[in-house]
Regions:
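Charged, alpha-helix-forming regions
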Residues: 1-444
Length: 444
């Protein structure tokens, strides 16, 4: 018995799928222009940040970022089915990250100046859910990465982006592919929601333990003493060093850690590692296990990495190494603090967000930290490390299952969107495997 997708492919595109370049299908437009820092302090219109575009395949519309737009001012508004792209990043692999406006909105929404938009001449020809998955697929990302130029900072060339080719099957096929792929992301979302609940529990205990004004902490946890806590600016107990400037390569004798290597949980990304060849100058930037690195710009600003091992590694120029006075504060204690609400409330106020976020030493040095005695810090670290392991150990439990689901989704997505000479047989194979999986789930 044929699946619905198989029937649609056989009926509507038996000879394959047509490809078109982006310049054949639509036009690019820019983000906000002519704006000063003051325009972003109090505004009368909402705008989409760089981070919103970078982080979300489908644009998040519940935003609070505002900008002042004059009555007769000419700026580009975002429309339904538009595709937004990040314009620059530290690495080519993070350039041109896409986000699709998949919902209708009556609000005028503007785009930050570090991103740009693309609008189809005939948007009715496209299914927005299909586009959401397509522009994050391996096939499209492989093309988009090649549009980035630069050495230490990479920028997307719109002239090259215009030559990117996309498959345009009939809309009925797009709809079915979009539904199929959304089913996989929904399964992952359910698991992620469960993990998020656990992470909230960890976050609650972390913020609870770091609130030394709460006498309840001492009463319930005898090893936590709130009576002798200092509140110290980070700049008074830390030394800051900016990273090394070099071009990240696929091969080399030393890992080159970049801002994009810091995951949301403060861990080092094991994937997409880049390298350099060590020389006398770069030796000054070698890392040791337990070192702290701060992302100072871009979508990862403010995130802090606790270097997990003694792998030979150098840190890049968009990172800041934080060297703490360990007679006052433990590195691991600071790392847990750097994920707390107390830290992020300060970081979000101190960061410069007029364009791409900037969180440099003059800002981070003003972050105030509660510093109890070292013995108390050690007890807090022991408690929080146990919670952290439950939430972030990729070898077992929910994190491992979520990772497996993500890989499964990526396989199905890239297979369904390949549209090569064997596209139909690929799609049929994938759909039948999906049907068998649903049968097994119903039987279990």
């Amino acid at each position: 018995m044929m699946t619905k997708l198989e029937e649609l492919v056989n009926e509507l595109c038996p000879d394959g799928v047509e490809y078109f370049t982006l310049e054949e299908l639509g036009t690019f437009y820019g983000g906000l222009t002519g704006k000063s820092k003051k325009d972003f302090e109090k505004g009368n219109a909402k705008f989409i940040t760089y981070m919103n575009v970078y982080s979300n395949p489908a644009l998040k519309l519940d935003v609070s970022d505002v900008v002042t737009i004059g009555e007769n001012e000419k700026q580009n508004c975002i429309q339904y089915a538009d595709i937004l792209f990040t314009g620059s990043s530290e690495t080519p692999n993070d350039c041109g990250m896409s986000s699709v406006l998949t919902e209708y909105t009556d609000e005028n929404l503007y785009l930050n100046s570090f991103s740009f938009g693309y609008r189809f001449n005939n948007p009715d020809k496209f299914d927005v859910i299909y586009l959401k998955h397509l522009f994050r697929s391996h096939m499209l990302r492989k093309q988009i990465v090649k549009t980035a130029n630069g050495v230490t900072r990479f920028n997307v060339s719109k002239a090259k982006m215009a030559k990117v080719q996309i498959p345009v099957p009939p809309k009925e096929v797009q709809n079915e592919i979009g539904k199929t792929l959304d089913n996989f992301t929904e399964l992952t979302a359910e698991l992620t929601a469960e993990l998020t609940a656990r992470q909230k529990q960890y976050a609650f205990y972390r913020d609870y333990l770091l609130d030394f004004s709460n006498e309840d902490v001492t009463k319930k946890i005898p090893d936590i003493d709130c009576s002798n806590v200092e509140y110290i600016k980070l700049g008074d107990i830390a030394k800051f060093t900016y990273g090394y400037t070099d071009k990240a390569k696929d091969y080399g004798d030393t890992r080159f850690i970049r801002i994009t290597d810091i995951l949301d949980n403060g861990y080092l990304n094991p994937n997409d590692a880049k390298y350099i060849n060590l020389n006398e100058e770069s030796k000054k930037y070698l890392l040791s296990k337990g070192d702290l690195l701060l992302a100072r710009t871009g979508a990862t600003y403010g995130k802090t990495l606790f270097v997990p091992n003694d792998e030979k590694a150098v840190y890049a120029s968009f990172l800041i190494k934080i060297e703490l006075d360990n007679t006052k504060i433990l590195n691991r204690y600071y790392w847990h603090f750097s994920k707390s609400n107390l830290y992020w409330k300060q970081a979000n106020k101190l960061v410069s967000t007029a364009g791409q976020p900037q969180f440099n030493t003059n800002a981070v040095s003003r972050v105030v930290i509660p510093v109890p005695p070292l013995s108390v810090q050690e007890n807090i670290v022991k408690i929080l490390d146990r919670f952290d392991k439950l939430n972030n150990d990729m070898s077992e439990g929910l994190p491992a299952e979520i990772e497996a689901r993500k890989k499964q989704y990526e396989y199905y997505r890239d297979t369904l969107l390949s549209f090569d000479d064997k596209a139909c047989s690929h799609i049929v194979k994938v759909e039948r495997e999906r049907e068998r999986e649903r049968e097994r789930e119903r039987e279990s």
